[in-house]
């Protein structure tokens, strides 16, 4: 490849920020004593590894302001880090501002979770979000990212979001945590969406076919440097992980999670060298071979 591991630069410039490693810790939890402890641990990991971090849904703290302190601690720990606030798509512009202010966020993730709400007995049944998302994105002072929560993004949705002021799209593909399954298990209605959705890979291909121009984040089953690399090849600017990081944190502790992230950094460097890619722009020129199943998917979706 005529390249050295010392000459690799896989940093990514997105949302007005230079991410030295194209990965961050994705939104998971918050609002309870146990969840706040997890967020503190994640913030320490993010700080030590120079990673961005997203907090879990702040809806509970917007409803009960006394719970906001648990979220605010993330900023106290990761004082100079890039933080994503997180609210649902039904929240007002005022609530969006409150969520951002709560953690002095650098960006806001607005999660869209129709397939999670429908199996819930108490879930929403009306989903008129696009106009509200655009209002928030056009008036908020920080970048706004629309985030799926494990069901992927289709061409139709990419094209709808192209007409809005959002800065980025987090595809949240199937393959990681399945919230439809979780909600079905605790629901009385048994509405089964276990197999619903597009995978992270399929969503990245959908973005290409929709000629997406928004910044792109790959989430959903990211568990290795190889998956980060594949996401970058297919057009993602960043990748992130929620469930995998949380599971490792609970099972092995924060030090082991940091070891995993360090290993990913080393492995990603080697993958760039192996493919003769000095940077992300060059890695997107890597020749691709698709499986028969993926070729079939592409053919049907053209």
Residue ranges and their predicted role:
Residues 1-15, 19, 293-295, 299-302:
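An N-cap/entry alpha-helix motif that binds or orients negatively charged groups
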Residues 105-129, 157-207, 250-252:
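Glycine/Thr-rich beta-alpha phosphate-binding loop at enzyme active sites
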Residues 67-85, 127-145, 189-216, 262-271:
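Alpha-helix-loop-beta-strand connector modules within alpha/beta enzyme cores
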Residues 191-215, 219, 223-302:
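Alpha/beta catalytic cores of nucleotide-metabolism and tRNA/nucleoside-modifying enzymes
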Residues 93-152, 157:
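Metal-dependent enolase-superfamily TIM-barrel catalytic cores that perform enediolate-based chemistry
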Residues 25, 46, 108, 169, ...:
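Conserved, mostly hydrophobic/aromatic
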